[in-house]
Amino acid sequence: MSSDKVKNGNEPEESEESCGDESASYTTNSTTSRSKSPSSSTRSKRRGRRSTKSKPKSRAAYKYDTHVKENHGANIFGVAFNTLLGKDEPQVFATAGSNRVTVYECPRQGGMQLLHCYADPDPDEVFYTCAWSYDLKTSSPLLAAAGYRGVIRVIDVEQNEAVGNYIGHGQAINELKFHPHKLQLLLSGSKDHAIRLWNIQSHVCIAILGGVEGHRDEVLSIDFNMRGDRIVSSGMDHSLKLWCLNTPEFHHKIELSNTFSQEKSTLPFPTVTKHFPDFSTRDIHRNYVDCVQWFGNFVLSKSCENAIVCWKPGQLHQSFEQVKPSDSSCTIIAEFEYDECEIWFVRFGFNPWQKVIALGNQQGKVYVWELDPSDPEGAHMTTLHNSRSVATVRQIAFSRDASVLVYVCDDATVWRWNRRQTTSI
């Protein structure tokens, strides 16, 4: 891959970055499409829902820096910053598209620098998602990636080789997330309607979430809360489900997985199956729910309806423990509206430390909301757009301090924007 960069300027030059592996190929077909949604009609207003009135701002919070194009020419579906690195360490992120996972550094002075590119041995693989962790013994950065083939690859970034391969899901994997504190725990959501919890240190599947009252269609998005004791999931069945891990059974299974040895044990690991979520609702969205993340005790979720919804289970005054599993009621806190994004598998970026959300649309534009913790409905919204950014924006990621915003597109481009120095987030 070349290291050509596009620098700041009013008339940016186009630049392509290649992986240097011409043997890897990509075939577009309907089975790997991430675009079609069941309805292209605009979202209808529903009773009790409050629209967020964004406060006007004089200029965009972020300024264009550079963009590159990966030479596979295919959709890039996923992007993730390594937020585990220290404040003084380089800002590193990875992209997932075609059968490749590409790692870049964002130098402080601007631009993008290629660090590594991993090409899956299966040329038919299409990666949809990636997530960062590190080896608990060596502290080497690890990158998990998965997609169309339903196989999770855990890659040692420095060695540029897979050190773990996890097979269990029957179909494609749509999202991966690592536990915020126990970084050997990896969560995966799949087209097979199930969520799995893995231990990448002992290479076992700890739990399967799904079944009797689980998702009825593809699981599209998953997330741990900041404490790591709850999971939220969403899917094609229009539902959002919450799963608690703070039970004696889960504590025991997680501890057991840390010491379990497949070589020494004559029996397989006793994977637990949780058929019943601790909360479930279909009252928030009327279409595929393709992105969900925790915001403290609130949940941010979106569908193909031109709005990100901030909500919580039960009534506003209720704690999660007071909400019964049989109660599907929920409270809408705020909505963040945008335009021209009515296809599925378009995922927003959220920086919980700096309270900023960003989402792209089908026209290559990006909406950025700077949240006011004292007034969730009074978010500042600005729009980012470069004349050369015209393809669907699939996912957005922020650096830990939110100084850099990166997004990836259907035309194989990767875009970097820098926070303006005068902007306070």
Swiss-Prot record:
Xref: PROSITE patterns: WD_REPEATS_1, WD_REPEATS_2, WD_REPEATS_REGION
InterPro entries: PcG_WD-repeat, WD40/YVTN_repeat-like_dom_sf, WD40_repeat_CS, WD40_repeat_dom_sf, WD40_rpt
Keyword terms of this UniProt record: Chromatin regulator, Developmental protein, Nucleus, Phosphoprotein, Repeat, Repressor, Transcription, Transcription regulation, WD repeat
Subcellular localization: Nucleus
Biased composition (Basic residues): 43-60
Biased composition (Low complexity): 21-42
Major localization class: nucleus
WD repeats: 71-114, 126-165, 168-208, 214-253, 284-321, 340-379, 388-424
Composition-biased stretches (Acidic residues): 11-20
Modified residues (Phosphoserine): 15
GO biological processes: anterior/posterior axis specification; facultative heterochromatin formation; heterochromatin formation; negative regulation of transcription by RNA polymerase II; regulation of transcription by RNA polymerase II; transcription initiation-coupled chromatin remodeling
Record carries keyword ATP-binding: no
Residue segments, region Disordered: 1-64
Superkingdom to which the source organism belongs: Eukaryota
Organ and tissue specificity: Widely expressed.
Composition-biased stretches (Basic and acidic residues): 1-10
Any one GO cellular component localisation term in the record: polytene chromosome
Function: Polycomb group (PcG) protein. While PcG proteins are generally required to maintain the transcriptionally repressive state of homeotic genes throughout development, this protein is specifically required during the first 6 hours of embryogenesis to establish the repressed state. Component of the Esc/E(z) complex, which methylates 'Lys-9' and 'Lys-27' residues of histone H3, leading to transcriptional repression of the affected target gene.
Complex and partners: Component of the polycomb repressive complex 2 (PRC2, also known as the Esc/E(Z) complex), composed of Caf1-55, esc, E(z), Su(z)12, and possibly pho. PRC2 associates with the accessory components Jarid2 and jing to form the PRC2 Jarid2-jing variant (PRC2.2). PRC2 may also associate with Pcl and HDAC1/Rpd3 during early embryogenesis. This complex is distinct from the PRC1 complex, which contains many other PcG proteins like Pc, Ph, Psc, Su(z)2. The two complexes however cooperate and interact together during the first 3 hours of development to establish PcG silencing.
Family label: Belongs to the WD repeat ESC family.
PANTHER family: POLYCOMB PROTEIN
Protein name as it appears in the record: Polycomb protein esc
